[in-house]
């Protein structure tokens, strides 16, 4: 049985604390495929979609105290470190789940979302997607969004290989919790 926390609508992100990192400075390799200006516009668009579906008015951190952030960057550089600030919209776990539900509920009637229906194969003819086979059923489509997430990564790698597609690994950003007395980090965390 698949792990509940990484499958389904929204995947693992559905149960996250709902923080949107609104920067081009880290978080993957999308800037390998487009320039930073275009990427920044897409990040802004995604933020606007989250706002339209329930995130409007949720706090964005990182715009205030620019002088203090500049000073932290200077101190980090003096220690041969990089302090990379980012704007973060904090939606919260409950609001994040509601937003994902509103998004799904907004799909037009001709869009079908199937859960608990693992895809066996992607159907391709003459270099164009035609559909998928899932659970012995054939589903035809003009466009396909294949987004298997971490849980389906192994299947997707094999499927891409069988279709002759080039794949590349992407780093996963992992947060690390370091517990120290509050006084040590207050100059950073209180900004």
Residue ranges and their predicted role:
Residues 1-27, 67-191:
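Residues forming the flavin
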Residues 7-61:
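Dinucleotide-binding Rossmann-like beta1-alpha1 core, especially the glycine-rich loop
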């Amino acid at each position: 049985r698949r792990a509940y926390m990484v499958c389904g609508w929204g995947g693992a992100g559905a149960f996250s604390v709902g923080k949107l990192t609104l920067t081009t400075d880290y978080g993957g390799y999308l800037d390998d495929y487009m320039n930073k200006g275009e990427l920044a516009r897409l990040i802004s668009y995604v933020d606007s979609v989250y706002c339209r579906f329930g995130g409007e008015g949720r706090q964005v951190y990182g715009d205030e105290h620019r002088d203090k952030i500049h000073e932290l960057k200077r101190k980090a550089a003096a220690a041969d470190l990089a302090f990379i600030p980012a704007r973060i919209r904090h939606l919260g776990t409950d609001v994040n789940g509601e937003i994902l539900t509103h998004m799904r509920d907004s799909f037009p009637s001709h869009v079908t979302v199937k859960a608990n229906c693992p895809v066996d194969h992607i159907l391709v003819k003459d270099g164009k997607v035609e559909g998928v086979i899932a659970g012995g059923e054939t589903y035809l489509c003009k466009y396909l969004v294949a987004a298997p997430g971490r849980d389906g990564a192994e299947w997707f790698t094999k499927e891409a290989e069988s279709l002759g597609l080039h794949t590349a690994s992407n780093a996963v950003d992992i947060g690390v919790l370091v517990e120290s007395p509050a006084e040590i980090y207050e100059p950073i965390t209180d900004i």
